[in-house]
Design a protein with these regions (language model features):
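Alpha-helical, coiled-coil/dimerization segments enriched in small aliphatic residues
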Residues: 51-56, 63, 169-197
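Structured C-terminal subdomain patch of bacterial secreted/periplasmic proteins
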Residues: 23-24, 28, 116-127, 136, ...
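A short, structured surface patch at a secondary-structure boundary
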Residues: 24-80, 84-90, 188
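N-terminal signal peptide c-region/cleavage motif recognized by signal peptidases
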Residues: 13-17
Length: 269
């Protein structure tokens, strides 16, 4: 009899836990879109940001194409009736009272700028959506990739600049720097960030240039500068394109670091 009561109690607790898992999750920033799509079935996602429909995101998370999108407006938030809202800690102050008014649980997920912070973000979000086992599996896969990268570091440590024609170069302490370190390379900019025109970039003389594909195929002054003849000559065969995915700290960032390592190895040849 006692065993039957205990079993019934456990079943009731498990049923309550399953029912408590959020079923209408709304994401208000692209980086939580990506984590959310990794963690839960699309049927539990009420809305992701419109940025999840960008080509770079759809390449990695094609399931995002079937999910409604939002632009973070008050009207959309109220109309969605979410039971969990994923937001940025730096959300507009005017939105905070509105989020409280929905009655939904709000989880603020800070930007992840290194792999330790990625682990923390995954665990925070996985707990919020009731998918902690899935979260740990994502972390384990990421860590396995990072171990492989460390074991296969290039013989020579190349100096690299992330420069896409805009002039601003991310330095130490950011996500790109963490990706470079994982790939076995060194950031040319040792401050938090730098600004380089074509002449100063050539004077700095990094071994390779890394640039994003965000502006590929579009006309802009930034794109024109990127095609400067001096750069085309100096860095022929030493220009590495990365997907816009690298902008968010997510478990797939380890895969981006692998892509960087493979590309840098080709530069050395």
């Amino acid at each position: 009899m006692k065993i039957g009561v205990f079993a019934a109690t456990v079943l009731l607790c498990l049923t309550g836990q399953a029912a408590a898992a959020p079923q209408r999750i709304m994401s208000l920033k692209v980086c939580t879109d990506e984590l959310l799509l990794d963690l839960v079935q699309p049927s539990r996602i009420a809305s992701v940001t419109f940025l999840s429909r960008e080509k770079a995101s759809l390449r990695q998370w094609p399931q995002g194409a079937s999910i409604p999108v939002n632009h973070g407006t008050a009207e959309e938030i109220l109309a969605t009736h979410p039971d969990l809202i994923l937001a940025d800690p730096f959300i507009a102050p005017a939105l905070r009272p509105l989020l409280d008014k929905t009655g939904a649980k709000v989880v603020e997920v800070p930007p992840a700028e290194n792999f330790d912070q990625i682990r923390s973000s995954v665990r925070l979000l996985a707990k919020a959506v009731g998918e902690e086992t899935r979260g740990e599996a994502l972390i384990a896969r990421m860590d396995a990739t990072l171990r492989d990268l460390k074991a296969q570091r290039p013989e020579k440590t190349l100096t690299v600049a992330e420069w896409g024609g805009g002039g601003y170069v991310p330095g130490r302490g950011g996500l790109f720097d963490a990706l470079l370190e994982a790939a076995g390379a060194r950031n040319v900019e040792q401050g938090s960030f730098g600004y380089y025109d074509v002449e100063s970039l050539i004077a700095k003389n990094p071994d390779a240039l890394v640039y994003g594909d965000t502006y590929a195929g579009t006309a802009s002054l930034r794109a024109d500068q990127d095609q400067h003849p001096a750069l085309m000559k100096r860095y022929a065969g030493k220009r590495i394109s990365y997907a816009a995915l690298y902008g968010c700290g997510v478990p797939e960032s380890a895969d981006v670091a692998r892509q960087l390592q493979d590309a840098l190895r080709k530069v050395q040849k």
